[in-house]
Amino acid sequence: MDIPVNAAKPGRRRYLTLVMIFITVVICYVDRANLAVASAHIQEEFGITKAEMGYVFSAFAWLYTLCQIPGGWFLDRVGSRVTYFIAIFGWSVATLFQGFATGLMSLIGLRAITGIFEAPAFPTNNRMVTSWFPEHERASAVGFYTSGQFVGLAFLTPLLIWIQEMLSWHWVFIVTGGIGIIWSLIWFKVYQPPRLTKGISKAELDYIRDGGGLVDGDAPVKKEARQPLTAKDWKLVFHRKLIGVYLGQFAVASTLWFFLTWFPNYLTQEKGITALKAGFMTTVPFLAAFVGVLLSGWVADLLVRKGFSLGFARKTPIICGLLISTCIMGANYTNDPMMIMCLMALAFFGNGFASITWSLVSSLAPMRLIGLTGGVFNFAGGLGGITVPLVVGYLAQGYGFAPALVYISAVALIGALSYILLVGDVKRVG
């Protein structure tokens, strides 16, 4: 595509918005990971079994997934500023209260509430990037904010462990929840849609708009202009192209949730690696994924600047990343810890490289239904978060981890094929 050239220098106000999204993603994922950090101490204090702890872990994923579509609908009605303020404030309060939980049921309830309020997060990110960035910069923007999830997991988990050891597990939730509450107030004070933002130049607005950015797409819909959803709207949301993207997101999320849930157990129980060594080995794949997601956005936008079509530039990193992720099953054929770590790091690098899937949602979704489409997209990812812990657990219990890794590889392959066979040309639906 042609990159617009303006006589006036466009300015860089949009990058402040991108940094704000990145910080929010870091907070979002730290508030997901804090329970894993504190789980052993919680089990000991409350006498919770591993099976019961499984219910606590899954409470987030179930409600997070179920609220994706309602969250997207709400986003389309009120816009990003209000949606994200309510979401960040809500999940942060629920996180803080987890530090005062009194037992199993209160933990389950509070984790479920956390999932409800986190549901609109990534549809909101997608809507903002669509409004703030031209097409040829969008993949890099998505890659940058998506990397926040790996920063939170790879770099901040040791800090949470230190807080727990210095104080108690309660403070893991109090600190992370308190930071989120403060950030929600900063967000509401600072963020505005592009046209309402102070300090943004007309040249930058023109640059974004001329490059395909929807500079008016992040404003809340006026009450009198709101339209009820119709059967035609739902048909557009489940267009063949978008179904291909949804399947791809299920595949990307499936690999991610294997690493979030079963990877440490795989190392210690299946491969007999010591807990200390496994702790180091779990960090390496997250760092590899962090590199992968940053590199994918850069590669996608570079291809656009080199004259390749938008569809080719966006789909190539996703397809390649999903195919690379299939190498995870190679760990079935070695017991060497270094080789296992390399294969797992390569697979998770591929997962990170494929994680710019959101950039295609912003290019394919019907303009009036970006939030709803993002909700369905994230719903598909949430299904991966629900099914992988269950399927891998069942396979590992009955047959060992080898068929579980084959399952993860097969899902990644299906995801790659969905982009090749279903998505086709990247053109906005409707």
Curated annotation (Swiss-Prot):
What switches on expression, per the entry, is described as: Part of the dgoRKADT operon, which encodes proteins for the metabolism of D-galactonate. Negatively regulated by DgoR. Expression is induced in the presence of D-galactonate.
- PROSITE patterns per the record? MFS (PS50850)
What Gene Ontology biological process does one annotation of this record name? D-galactonate transmembrane transport
Question: Where is D-galactonate annotated to bind?
Answer: Y29, R32, Y64, W358
| Superkingdom of this protein's organism | Bacteria
The membrane spanning regions, by residue number, are 18-39, 51-74, 82-100, 104-125, 142-164, 169-190, 242-267, 277-297, 315-333, 337-354, 374-395, 401-423
* Subcellular location(s) per record: Cell inner membrane
Null allele outcome, as annotated, is: Deletion mutant cannot grow on D-galactonate.
Give ranges for the Periplasmic compartment. 40-50, 101-103, 165-168, 268-276, 334-336, 396-400
One of the entry's Gene Ontology molecular-function terms is:
solute:proton symporter activity
Enumerate the UniProt keywords alphabetically.
Answer: Cell inner membrane, Cell membrane, Membrane, Symport, Transmembrane, Transmembrane helix, Transport
Q: Name one GO cellular component term.
A: plasma membrane
Q: How does it sit in the membrane?
A: Multi-pass membrane protein
Q: Where is this site: Important for transport activity?
A: D31, E118
Report the main location listed first in the record. Answer: membrane
Q: How is its activity regulated?
A: Uptake is inhibited by the proton ionophore nigericin, which dissipates the proton gradient, and by the potassium ionophore valinomycin, which dissipates the membrane potential.
What reactions does this protein catalyze? D-galactonate(in) + H(+)(in) = D-galactonate(out) + H(+)(out)
List the Cytoplasmic topological domains: 1-17, 75-81, 126-141, 191-241, 298-314, 355-373, 424-430
What function is annotated for this protein?
A: Involved in D-galactonate metabolism. Catalyzes the proton-dependent uptake of galactonate into the cell.
Instruction: Report the sequence similarity comment from the record.
Output: Belongs to the major facilitator superfamily. Phthalate permease family.
The cross-references to PANTHER family, in alphabetical order and at most eight, read: D-GALACTONATE TRANSPORTER, SOLUTE CARRIER FAMILY 17
Domain remarks: Major conformational changes and local movement around the substrate site occur to accommodate substrate for transport. Active transport requires reversible protonation of both Asp-31 and Glu-118.
Q: What else is known?
A: The exact stoichiometry of cotransport is not determined and could be greater than 1.
Protein name as it appears in the record: D-galactonate transporter
| Protein's organism | Escherichia coli (strain K12)
Gene name of the record: dgoT
